[in-house]
């Protein structure tokens, strides 16, 4: 299995990209890597070139560039070349920590959509915070690929999320929920009410109804489906709340006197465990589901651990054949039309 890597994408590239790739290479003997980037910057960072191949590129797409224009103009950029390698069958998957919009555009216009998918959805794995939960994470999409969605898009996301949860997370018959402003059936705008009816009518989906943003991290669903605008806003609010709580805790320890500092020392292992559980580096990257091959992006500030874990995630996708199974399902749109519940 070969992964095309954008070695130049990310705030700390190419150093952390190379470090993470080498850690993954040492862990998985069945993986090979093509590193797309500037050889003068990439080669000195490689400790062992076993199963690593540098593919020279002369251009980079920066974080601030307009995505579609960039991939059209910078044909020799690391993002475009890596995505093209996947399209041409020279690699099995594409990984980057670079410009999110450019990665999405390259995935959509170069790698291409699966037949039957109208709009691919950006899919993240989020932690479950509920103590004693049977699972530690869940699938969340669309987290920002599409600001506006139609009923059919969210229906497709439910199936994409189902296949991903089954094959990558190993969840049998995953519970699927719709992100909404209330748990009741009649909540939401016209779009969400219609999507609720559609998902509830499918006998091959384990639809458990609406879920509110406040319940996202409490293990009530294995797959949460939403339009990109709502899902991204809820995700950012959750991240902001977590940061605020950590800031308040640190401030309380710093200004709380000796007793607070002693309490912190006693609870330090607990804080470390919580930090690991909530860290984005633990859960890999965001997948643009609905494409003909794995296209996976990790956050721009990713460290080597995040890179390694994202590559592990890609490997699982390749080994389980989740894309092939998704293609097989969507190859005939009759699958969606014929999956109505018996009334």
Curated annotation (Swiss-Prot):
Subcellular location field: Cytoplasm
Recorded metabolic or biological pathway in which this protein acts: Lipid metabolism; phospholipid metabolism
SUPFAM superfamilies linked: Isocitrate/Isopropylmalate dehydrogenase-like
Reactions it catalyzes: a fatty acyl-[ACP] + phosphate = an acyl phosphate + holo-[ACP]
GO-annotated biological processes: fatty acid biosynthetic process; phospholipid biosynthetic process
Pfam families associated with the record: FA_synthesis
HAMAP family the UniProt entry points to: PlsX
Family: Belongs to the PlsX family.
The protein, known as: Phosphate acyltransferase
Naturally occurring in which organism (per UniProt): Limosilactobacillus reuteri (strain DSM 20016) (Lactobacillus reuteri)
């Amino acid at each position: 299995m070969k992964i095309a890597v954008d070695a130049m994408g990310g705030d700390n590239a190419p150093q952390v990209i190379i470090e993470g790739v080498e850690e993954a290479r040492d862990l998985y003997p069945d993986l090979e890597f093509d590193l797309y980037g500037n050889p003068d910057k990439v080669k000195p960072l490689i400790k062992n070139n076993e199963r690593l191949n540098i593919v020279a590129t002369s251009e980079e797409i920066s974080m601030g560039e307009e995505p579609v224009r960039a991939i059209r103009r910078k044909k020799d950029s690391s993002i475009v070349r890596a995505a093209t390698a996947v399209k041409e069958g020279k690699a099995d998957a594409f990984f980057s920590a670079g410009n999110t919009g450019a990665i999405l555009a390259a995935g959509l216009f170069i790698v291409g959509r699966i037949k039957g998918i109208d709009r691919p959805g950006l899919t993240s794995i989020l932690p479950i915070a509920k103590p004693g939960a049977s699972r530690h994470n869940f699938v969340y999409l669309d987290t920002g690929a599409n600001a506006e969605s139609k009923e059919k898009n969210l229906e497709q996301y439910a199936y994409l999320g189902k296949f991903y949860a089954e094959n990558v997370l190993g969840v049998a018959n995953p519970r699927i929920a719709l992100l909404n402003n209330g748990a009741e059936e009649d909540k939401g705008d016209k779009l969400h009410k219609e999507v609720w009816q559609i998902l509830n009518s499918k006998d091959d989906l384990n639809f458990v109804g609406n879920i509110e943003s406040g319940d996202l991290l409490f293990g009530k669903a294995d797959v949460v489906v939403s339009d990109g605008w709502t899902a991204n806003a809820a995700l950012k609010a959750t991240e902001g709340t977590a940061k605020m709580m950590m800031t308040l805790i640190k401030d309380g320890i710093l200004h709380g006197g000796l007793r607070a500092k002693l309490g912190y020392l006693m609870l330090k292992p607990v804080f470390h465990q919580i930090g690991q559980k909530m860290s984005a580096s633990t859960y890999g990257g965001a997948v643009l589901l609905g494409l003909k091959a794995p296209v996976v992006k990790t956050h721009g500030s990713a460290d080597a651990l995040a890179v390694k874990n994202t590559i592990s995630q890609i490997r699982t996708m390749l080994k389980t054949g989740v894309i092939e199974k998704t293609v097989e399902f969507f190859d005939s749109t009759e699958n969606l039309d014929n999956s109505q519940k018996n009334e």
